[in-house]
């Protein structure tokens, strides 16, 4: 298999259990995305493997620990380790989330939502600018999945994210599964969100699966990254690229990891839709399953 089988914009998330397969078999993709924090130790076995894989794949560094929404600012040690990783790997993309996860040196095992207020906006933008100055490059900010919202928020999430981009010149990572999940949980329309986001600033798209959890009050949709991409999210992707064109597109799968072939099959679905969009054709009716 050559690394031209997939469209160059199609990639998958590289997770530690799949390391050996990608290292030895080199599936025919152009790029892989890592969780930055898993590779902060420069002499670790997995870091050495990654260095070798980086000779064959472009690498994107996707962070989960910068906690850009923290009032106290970005942890300097965390930023230093990220900078060392970025300087060594020279990834073509670096990203993190519209969220916070650290307070007073204590890290939470989740990406927590922000209140969408002017005060939070100033904090978030200050931290983004600090990181971009340290890394000497723009970073991508990903829209979150969310399960609660603050009563004192004064603007919508999409307005907040758009303003972050305007004030910091960062780029955007559009997670379509997060949009779909949050739209159900909070009762907004996906199209309202997607039409408000400045498409020209979107450099990457994430596609993943979600889980439905039943509660006494009703259902909640959770962005678990443990399922195939849903038909509805595929349809959002098809519509978005038809309107705005090709972007680097990632298949995310973090929990209940399937065999690599299953992951690559999801990537092939994205590849099919992307190539069809570039040819201005529609390979399938939205009602048809992609499985």
From Swiss-Prot:
InterPro entries: MbnB/TglH/ChrH (IPR007801), Xyl_isomerase-like_sf (IPR036237). Pfam families: MbnB_TglH_ChrH (PF05114). PANTHER family: UPF0276 PROTEIN HI_1600. NCBIfam families: PRK05409.1. Belongs to the UPF0276 family. This is UPF0276 protein VV1_0952.
